[in-house]
Swiss-Prot record:
A Pfam cross-reference name: Leu_Phe_trans
Protein name in UniProt: Leucyl/phenylalanyl-tRNA--protein transferase
Record's keyword terms, sorted: Acyltransferase, Cytoplasm, Transferase
Natural source organism: Leptospira interrogans serogroup Icterohaemorrhagiae serovar Lai (strain 56601)
Record's catalysed reaction(s): N-terminal L-lysyl-[protein] + L-leucyl-tRNA(Leu) = N-terminal L-leucyl-L-lysyl-[protein] + tRNA(Leu) + H(+); N-terminal L-arginyl-[protein] + L-leucyl-tRNA(Leu) = N-terminal L-leucyl-L-arginyl-[protein] + tRNA(Leu) + H(+); L-phenylalanyl-tRNA(Phe) + an N-terminal L-alpha-aminoacyl-[protein] = an N-terminal L-phenylalanyl-L-alpha-aminoacyl-[protein] + tRNA(Phe)
GO MF assignments: leucyl-tRNA--protein transferase activity
Function description: Functions in the N-end rule pathway of protein degradation where it conjugates Leu, Phe and, less efficiently, Met from aminoacyl-tRNAs to the N-termini of proteins containing an N-terminal arginine or lysine.
Enzyme Commission no: 2.3.2.6
SUPFAM superfamilies reported for this sequence: Acyl-CoA N-acyltransferases (Nat)
One GO BP annotation of this record: protein catabolic process
Family: Belongs to the L/F-transferase family.
HAMAP family the UniProt entry points to: Leu_Phe_trans
Length: 219
């Protein structure tokens, strides 16, 4: 892995959230960043963050309502992995009347990261084959960073997240990073931990460096 330690501040000792400004979104830089607890927001210029506190999910404690559980069990949908990565990103970026950090530069760069086996998507299709929801994120070793999700059909994003959790548990993932807490992730059970604890858990989770191949799961 290429060394970018001269570009990024060391998040173990740097006490500010922004650890670098500028650079590019090359696969090598993204891989180094995520393995060290750093992620990019915005692209004019690119700002690189390591937040304190950090928001994570416990993979065994996703909050699912009884109504949503019934909808999940009805199985009026199909789940796929990595079938429409760029489309999922564009759907996540589609927010009429709102700004989005998922710009064309991010879509192009993360699609390249996807082709290298580090970025992944989960798609939720309705009974007519329409893409109704999805999630995408980064997987390294036993670490997953959830980047964004969308629902064009009510609850399909949450259904996708449920199946993502189940799949990650089967593949022995140990850390699910949600970066920053918001109302949606909070309602689903996300919580915050100190950066120091997060970085310690991250180091263990990414240690193997293995790429994830979820295609063997049939949902």
């Amino acid at each position: 892995m290429k060394d970018f330690s001269d570009f990024f501040r060391n998040p173990h000792i740097w006490d500010r959230e922004i650890v670098a400004v500028g650079g590019d979104l090359s696969p090598e830089r993204l891989l180094y960043a995520y393995k060290n607890g750093i992620f990019p927001w915005s692209d004019q210029p690119i700002l690189w963050y390591c937040l304190d506190p950090r928001s994570i999910f416990d993979l065994n404690k996703l909050h699912i309502s009884k109504r949503l559980k019934r909808k999940i069990n009805q199985k009026r949908y199909t789940i796929t992995f990595n079938r429409a990565f760029e489309q999922v990103m564009r759907c996540c970026a589609y927010r009429p009347g709102e700004d989005t950090w998922i710009t064309d530069l991010f879509i192009k760069s993360y699609t390249e990261f996807h082709k290298l086996g580090y970025a992944h998507s989960l798609e939720v299709w309705d009974e007519n084959g329409k893409l109704g929801g999805g999630v995408y994120g980064i997987a390294i070793g036993n670490f997953f960073a959830g980047e964004s999700m969308f629902s064009f059909i009510p609850d399909f994003g949450k259904i996708g997240l449920f199946h993502l959790f189940e799949t990650l548990k089967k593949d022995h993932f140990t850390l699910f990073d949600t970066q920053q807490l918001n109302l949606v992730t909070l309602s689903l059970g996300a919580y915050q931990i100190p950066k120091k604890e997060y970085l310690k858990r991250l180091e263990s989770a990414v240690a193997s460096g293995k790429k994830w191949n979820p295609s063997h799961f049939v949902l």
